[in-house]
């Protein structure tokens, strides 16, 4: 058996304290935080709100103020009994909502939570209003899937977001593989948008009229719409939607615009040109499909403000924050911080009207089937148990 000298024992005792530092962008404090409260060299522990502090690039490493038991607004620490839509409304936002899909609505344990309109005040149909679901054959429309979710929203007193009119993906082959003149495709877009939006007239708060028009490098996607009509297809779709339902808000919805870059710049320039030409456009949707630990809340806030300055409202439309599996306590804690950062960014921008998660439970998340080895992206786990992320959301609305 080895015997440690007094000096070695003292050195060993110091090791945990040396190692117990949060990495850059890691959490370093806040109400309920039990992890490290100092940051690695070159970063500073900055308090964003009483519920979390984060190691941001800077010159010094300092500990955050000791957490108190109340929020800055005087409320108590959010608990798992919090109702997110109720909190969002109390904070001055229009809604907290979720996407859902028709196949999920046969799961009674799922719908028992989904139907709670104090938890979710808004619903987005994930797939049943897309082109392949609504006009699978030219001129032949079917609305059964969308109607089911629209009825659910009406029954529960929830806002409904329409998703979507024009998108490069999930198109029936007669559209995606068609060979059209500009006049023909213009008529096809007008008929599809008009028929779809008219069918749900008076039921939909906002439509994602155009979805994901740009590549990540800021160039336009080369799909049947752009290849045939150039950029004018956006105006065609927006004008058709406005004529069909003058009271619905009209959005362009995009991902990877949560930070400054070529894609965000291209979309911003499009917004400016559309507004200058008096083309109807009311909002920009920030999808926010994010990765744990790779996200800047202040960066998102800046982007929300930049777009809002163009005279449009903004919304978080498809929020989830994925991680490399398996999940760990550290990853779940960081995910809590990241969800809180998104809510805080929206809270700090008056024109950010609400937040929608892209389904609320890991059981029905799209992430594992799209990103190999990743998942656990939602605020509830696959057994419908609230994760730390839930409290991150609640704290953001309560701050």
Curated annotation (Swiss-Prot):
<keyword id="KW-0964">Secreted</keyword>
<protein>
    <recommendedName>
        <fullName>Endo-1,4-beta-xylanase C</fullName>
        <ecNumber>3.2.1.8</ecNumber>
    </recommendedName>
</protein>
<dbReference type="GO" id="GO:0030248">
    <property type="term" value="F:cellulose binding"/>
</dbReference>
<feature type="domain" description="CBM1">
    <location>
        <begin position="21"/>
        <end position="56"/>
    </location>
</feature>
<dbReference type="InterPro" id="IPR031158">
    <property type="entry name" value="GH10_AS"/>
</dbReference>
<keyword id="KW-0858">Xylan degradation</keyword>
<comment type="similarity">
    <text>Belongs to the glycosyl hydrolase 10 (cellulase F) family.</text>
</comment>
<feature type="domain" description="GH10">
    <location>
        <begin position="81"/>
        <end position="396"/>
    </location>
</feature>
<keyword id="KW-0326">Glycosidase</keyword>
<dbReference type="InterPro" id="IPR017853">
    <property type="entry name" value="Glycoside_hydrolase_SF"/>
</dbReference>
<feature type="active site" description="Proton donor">
    <location>
        <position position="212"/>
    </location>
</feature>
<feature type="disulfide bond">
    <location>
        <begin position="346"/>
        <end position="352"/>
    </location>
</feature>
<dbReference type="Pfam" id="PF00734">
    <property type="entry name" value="CBM_1"/>
</dbReference>
<feature type="signal peptide">
    <location>
        <begin position="1"/>
        <end position="20"/>
    </location>
</feature>
<keyword id="KW-0119">Carbohydrate metabolism</keyword>
<comment type="function">
    <text>Endo-1,4-beta-xylanase involved in the hydrolysis of xylan, a major structural heterogeneous polysaccharide found in plant biomass representing the second most abundant polysaccharide in the biosphere, after cellulose.</text>
</comment>
<dbReference type="InterPro" id="IPR001000">
    <property type="entry name" value="GH10_dom"/>
</dbReference>
<keyword id="KW-0732">Signal</keyword>
<dbReference type="InterPro" id="IPR044846">
    <property type="entry name" value="GH10"/>
</dbReference>
<dbReference type="GO" id="GO:0005576">
    <property type="term" value="C:extracellular region"/>
</dbReference>
<dbReference type="GO" id="GO:0045493">
    <property type="term" value="P:xylan catabolic process"/>
</dbReference>
<keyword id="KW-0378">Hydrolase</keyword>
<dbReference type="Pfam" id="PF00331">
    <property type="entry name" value="Glyco_hydro_10"/>
</dbReference>
<dbReference type="InterPro" id="IPR000254">
    <property type="entry name" value="Cellulose-bd_dom_fun"/>
</dbReference>
<feature type="active site" description="Nucleophile">
    <location>
        <position position="318"/>
    </location>
</feature>
<dbReference type="GO" id="GO:0031176">
    <property type="term" value="F:endo-1,4-beta-xylanase activity"/>
</dbReference>
<keyword id="KW-0624">Polysaccharide degradation</keyword>
<keyword id="KW-1015">Disulfide bond</keyword>
<comment type="pathway">
    <text>Glycan degradation; xylan degradation.</text>
</comment>
<dbReference type="InterPro" id="IPR035971">
    <property type="entry name" value="CBD_sf"/>
</dbReference>
């Amino acid at each position: 058996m080895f015997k440690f000298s007094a000096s070695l024992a003292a050195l060993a005792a110091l090791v945990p304290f040396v190692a117990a530092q949060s990495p850059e962008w890691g959490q370093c404090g806040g109400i309920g935080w039990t992890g490290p409260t100092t940051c690695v060299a070159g970063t500073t522990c900055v308090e964003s709100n009483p519920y979390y502090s984060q190691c941001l690039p800077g010159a010094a490493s300092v500990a955050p103020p000791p957490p108190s038991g109340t929020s800055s607004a005087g409320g108590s620490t959010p608990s798992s009994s919090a109702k997110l839509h109720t909190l969002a409304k109390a904070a001055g936002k229009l809604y907290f909502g979720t996407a859902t899909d028709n196949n999920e609505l046969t799961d009674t344990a799922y719908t028992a939570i989904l139907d709670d309109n104090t938890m979710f005040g808004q619903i987005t149909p994930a797939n049943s209003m897309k082109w392949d679901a609504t006009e699978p054959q030219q001129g032949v429309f079917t609305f059964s899937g969308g109607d089911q979710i629209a009825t659910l929203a009406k029954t529960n007193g929830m806002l409904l977001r329409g998703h979507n009119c024009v998108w490069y993906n999930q198109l029936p082959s007669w559209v995606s593989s068609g060979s059209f003149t500009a006049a023909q495709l213009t008529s096809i877009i007008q008929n599809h948008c008009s028929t779809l939006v008219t069918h749900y007239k008076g039921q939909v708060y906002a439509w994602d009229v155009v979805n994901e028009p740009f590549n990540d490098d800021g160039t336009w996607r080369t799909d049947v719409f752009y290849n045939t009509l150039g950029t004018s297809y956006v105006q065609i779709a927006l004008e058709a939607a406005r004529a069909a339902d003058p009271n619905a808000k009209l959005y362009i919805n995009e991902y990877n615009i949560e930070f400054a870059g070529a894609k965000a710049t291209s979309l911003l320039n499009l917004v400016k040109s559309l507004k200058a030409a008096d083309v109807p456009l009311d909002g920009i949707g920030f999808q926010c499909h994010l990765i744990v630990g790779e996200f800047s809340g202040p960066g998102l806030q800046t982007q929300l403000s930049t777009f809002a300055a163009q005279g449009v409202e903004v919304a978080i439309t498809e929020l989830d924050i994925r991680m490399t599996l398996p999940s760990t306590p550290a990853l779940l804690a960081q995910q809590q911080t990241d969800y809180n950062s998104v809510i805080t960014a929206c809270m700090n921008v008056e024109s950010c009207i609400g937040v929608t998660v892209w389904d609320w439970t890991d059981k029905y998340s799209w992430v594992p089937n799209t990103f190999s080895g990743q998942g656990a992206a939602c605020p509830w786990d696959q057994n419908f148990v609230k994760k730390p992320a839930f409290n991150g959301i609640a704290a953001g609305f309560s701050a």
